[in-house]
Amino acid sequence: MFFACYCALRTNVKKYRYQDEDGPHDHSLPRLTHEVRGPELVHVSEKNLSQIENVHGYVLQSHISPLKASPAPIIVNTDTLDTIPYVNGTEIEYEFEEITLERGNSGLGFSIAGGTDNPHIGDDPGIFITKIIPGGAAAEDGRLRVNDCILRVNEVDVSEVSHSKAVEALKEAGSIVRLYVRRRRPILETVVEIKLFKGPKGLGFSIAGGVGNQHIPGDNSIYVTKIIDGGAAQKDGRLQVGDRLLMVNNYSLEEVTHEEAVAILKNTSDVVYLKVGKPTTIYMTDPYGPPDITHSYSPPMENHLLSGNNGTLEYKTSLPPISPGRYSPIPKHMLGEDDYTRPPEPVYSTVNKLCDKPASPRHYSPVECDKSFLLSTPYPHYHLGLLPDSDMTSHSQHSTATRQPSVTLQRAISLEGEPRKVVLHKGSTGLGFNIVGGEDGEGIFVSFILAGGPADLSGELQRGDQILSVNGIDLRGASHEQAAAALKGAGQTVTIIAQYQPEDYARFEAKIHDLREQMMNHSMSSGSGSLRTNQKRSLYVRAMFDYDKSKDSGLPSQGLSFKYGDILHVINASDDEWWQARRVTLDGDSEEMGVIPSKRRVERKERARLKTVKFNAKPGVIDSKGDIPGLGDDGYGTKTLRGQEDLILSYEPVTRQEINYTRPVIILGPMKDRINDDLISEFPDKFGSCVPHTTRPKRDYEVDGRDYHFVISREQMEKDIQEHKFIEAGQYNDNLYGTSVQSVRFVAERGKHCILDVSGNAIKRLQVAQLYPIAIFIKPKSLEPLMEMNKRLTEEQAKKTYDRAIKLEQEFGEYFTAIVQGDTLEDIYNQCKLVIEEQSGPFIWIPSKEKL
């Protein structure tokens, strides 16, 4: 058996995407002037956008309170432009803005990509915003957007500089940072119908997006991401990257999951009819410009929104609407890097909603409200109130989080005890509220409204509402479990009968508070149970499972979702059931804090589910999606190690350590050989091989120490193996081969990544040797992607490959640094590169000896 190991020159690993085509270089970037005239439309040339989706970014994060106001947007003097350029016969329009941010302890709160040495979009040397970090200065200010191009940092021109120069300018900008940015004007779409005839290559295009897998933040739509050469779409010529798929034959693709969209497209006949939304540039003149709510209080612009039968918005106007739930139909390669940690955005609920809050730069429609309609329509339980709104802002990187006064329709209940009807559309975060109650017939109450969720955006529910029924199911005497089940199984459109009962809820809340205090006091005095913050102020753990807060009906308050491998800072572990925690990012703790299930709760629920599996399923039965039959979908993606049924993976205590070597890399699972080969091929100066040992005699053309380390005797190598000097060894043709700890250390201490083609057992052996590897497990989603990525596989071979991967996860799951999944080899490859970059150090999280 041969044991290959690869090494790489240590640098700051950058993020890459394959480039399909480049556009011509843009030589007409305007220079900002200090002369500011009245607002004017500025037309600036833009090149064709390439397929580059992701290069590398520099992350700066900050938490600012309060924010300092910055000047009004700067409009470039159009006299400085001689002519109005065109792109393929189309005028491309930009707007320019000056944004002032105050740097906090952690930075500015955004990521960048691009530069003259590594263009982000085609040949454009600009520095582009690829990510707005929630809770940072940029997110709190609310004006900086993904895909903005930074032209100047304070007085430093960064319009045509290298990436490192831009990073340096941002680092040295001081505590008050003025950014001059350029962005495209808003985009609408035109709906067209396309008829395609399937050929040998099928329809010939790739898609991304869907509920729970958003391609554009806040948007559940399905987008075209690639046109395949020689396919039906390319031959037809009308479908393009960035188009939004609305319908396939008679099936709507609105609010469907990615898997549902794929299934609909696969189950089509030879002739396929597509309804497609194509982006169309529009020019917003001043009368329709978004209000500047950052600097001043704007008069209300009331929008009259009606809910059509298909759930879409209808505007009482002849102007085409802008979908409120979307930023823009720009393809993802214009929105910057993929963000695997970004939480899903909520879907807007528009039913029974008379007026919305004023438009913001993210959500704008120049439509006036028909006030006569409002006055004439009978709504017996509501009256209009123009009150300041501080809770309706969606917490996204494009939202305006500077809580300036704005006008919204506020619901007031004229008769406190009268039931009312509320209709919500489920989003990716569920319905956006929590419930309590259900004991001793006390009723089910709304205890928490998720900011930006469907309930919040509808304005129809509030804390203290009693839920009387859900889709006709009476909940007045229901238990908590019955109410949770009714809400979870209610479908996409949920009709709720609610009744505002503030006094009943206050009595219930007081009782819960007393019970919780008693439990906390008992827990603190008992000396047993989970680790407590009075015993240990700072507790860090690594999540060993996926947790989706939107699927956990038992949450006592706002939850915190996380993925396998995430580092969590547990702030309060004094409760046996729930812990308070923050997710730890590369820049420190994130601003978002929420509750997570305790170790005890996770393990108890998993054991209960394992008993159900043993009762309902045949031993060892795992379906083609990797799911164990009988498991409930409650947000806990926990795992049990094979052969160790008492060992349930929940949280692993970790400690932060600085390392002075470059971490080895072990990739396990299907396609690992192709990933290793691609890393070496694309980065030959960063990834290579280390030298294995063997007892085989040296051949004439071989050099000791270059081709192999030739061991003098078999006895000596067997002795070294017994003394744990090898991470893995085996026998081939009566000769021993192996990879020694010293060989790996030799590579690591010289600043090179060492990719090891070894089994999962080697991970633990490297950890014992104080060489903590980056262990990446490629987990197949199902048989179909395996067969798609390797056309030579038969279904039987794919099934065996899939089963081996599942067993591999069961055996070594506790040692993985990260688990990656993807539908294509390119997607998996890019995720692996991202993990390697993020986990390279010099500060890493390693297992601690602490016991939870």
Swiss-Prot record:
The keyword DNA-binding does not apply. Disulfide bonds: none annotated. GO terms for molecular function: kinase binding; structural constituent of postsynaptic density. The modification Phosphoserine is found at residues 28, 65, 307, 328, 360, 365, 406, 414, 528, 530, 553. Disruption phenotype: Mice do not respond to persistent pain. Postsynaptic surface expression of NMDA receptors and NMDA receptor-mediated synaptic function are reduced in dorsal horn neurons of the spinal cord. GO terms for cellular component: axon cytoplasm; axon initial segment; cell junction; cytoplasm; glutamatergic synapse; juxtaparanode region of axon; neuromuscular junction; nucleus. This is Disks large homolog 2. The lineage of its organism: Eukaryota, Metazoa, Chordata, Craniata, Vertebrata. The gene is Dlg2.
